[in-house]
UniProtKB/Swiss-Prot annotation:
ATP binds at residues 35-42. It comes from the Bacteria. Gene3D superfamilies: 2.40.50.100, P-loop containing nucleotide triphosphate hydrolases. It catalyses: molybdate(out) + ATP + H2O = molybdate(in) + ADP + phosphate + H(+). This is Molybdenum import ATP-binding protein ModC 2. Pfam families: ABC_tran, TOBE. It is found in: Cell inner membrane. The gene is modC2.
């Protein structure tokens, strides 16, 4: 598929609800669609799949799927679609479900091998089981695998983990993370989970009342306090870094991120591997001078970009510039005034906790 992603302007009226979505998404990686319940996320995915007859324009990978003069029906759109509760062919076993779409794809067009996908999702012990007997977790693993084995040009995932327990989610997330760097197609992923956003998103789209109102790299959007992503207590940013080395004695790993290095819990990843860390604004304090003799391991020199005073609150959100990224600090207004904090001022960010997302 050409290195072109998704371009869409889709409009749809359903009673009092109106979808008016504008998308321009990268050609590969995971684009996460985030919004409140009822904001139109599922409706947008159904419109992209052709299951809802929306007006407008849709192009995927340089191929026109619809405009004012043409409309490809769902069966002519090269896509995989996995829902919250996916349906399999109940009378067939897991292997037959996997092979059903795979065998219909010409060998030259297959993006992934059958055995490769079986291993990726840990399906070896399920192959002879009837699909109708599968619990929710294994069922979703099989459903995602089936969608991938059709070698689609676009994969739509509508909150595929929302009904699963923690153990089942932990089996699927690493596979999706691996696919992100391996599969050269766009994935459009709906979720309500901040953990999933942190671990999976290469691109973030915010939807509210049927309209897309922000789109871009997660680091930029998550570090903008003006966007209604989280309650201020839960505000956090994600930094992409690289594992530098491990210290088995203290059970710590060093990760290089924009602006310096961070000590994190001992990682399973080898040195040189890319990883992601999450830093909550509530876990960051500020100092004008380099802290000495502190128990806090992670201290970065940063520059204040902006201060945002929270309405009817004693708190202020401070956005801090690193070399090519931002983090947030949520402190009291009293502390901000005492320190004389202002845009452009250089300070030291003391990070009490860093979560390694793996």
């Amino acid at each position: 598929m050409p290195e072109q992603g998704i371009e869409a302007q889709l409009r749809l009226q359903r009673g009092a609800f109106r979808l008016d979505a504008h998308l321009q998404l990268p050609a590969n990686g995971i684009s996460v669609l985030l919004g409140r319940s009822g904001s139109g996320k599922t409706t947008l995915l159904r419109a992209i799949a052709g299951l809802e007859r929306a007006e407008g324009f849709l192009q995927v990978g340089g191929q026109l799927w619809q405009d004012a003069t043409c409309f490809r029906p769902p069966h002519q759109r090269s896509l995989g679609y996995v829902r919250q509760a996916s349906e399999l062919l109940p009378h067939l076993d897991v292997r037959a479900n996997l092979e059903f779409g795979y065998r219909r794809i010409p060998r030259a067009r297959r993006r992934l091998g059958l055995d490769e996908v079986i291993a990726l999702f840990g399906l070896e012990d399920l192959l002879d089981q009837r699909a109708e007997w599968l619990p929710n977790g294994p069922r979703q693993r099989v459903a995602i695998a089936c969608a991938l084995l059709t070698s689609p040009d676009l994969l739509l995932l509508d909150a595929p983990l929302i009904c699963l327990d923690r153990h089942s989610r932990a089996q699927i997330l690493p596979a999706l993370e691996q696919l992100r760097g391996q599969l050269r197609i766009p994935l459009l992923y709906v979720t309500h989970s901040q953990d999933e956003v942190t671990r999976l998103a290469d691109h973030l789209i915010l939807l509210d009342k049927g309209k897309t109102f922000a789109s871009g790299p997660p680091g930029r959007l998550l570090s903008d306090p003006r966007l209604p992503l989280n309650h201020p207590d839960e505000a956090a940013v994600v930094l992409i870094g690289q594992v530098e080395h491990h210290d088995p004695h203290y059970r710590l790993s060093t990760v290089r991120v924009p602006g310096g290095t961070l000590s994190v819990s001992l990682s399973r990843l080898p040195p040189g591997a890319e990883t992601r860390v999450r830093i909550f604004a509530r876990d960051v304090s500020l100092s004008l001078d380099p802290p000495h003799n502190s128990s806090i391991l992670n201290i970065l020199r940063v520059r204040i970009a902006d201060l945002f005073h929270e309405q009817d609150s004693a708190r202020v959100m401070v956005r801090l510039d690193l070399d090519s990224a931002c983090i947030l600090a949520r402190i009291t207004r009293l502390s901000a005034d005492r320190l004389g904090l202002a845009p452009g001022l250089q300070v030291y960010a003391q990070i009490k906790s860093v979560a390694l997302m793996e």
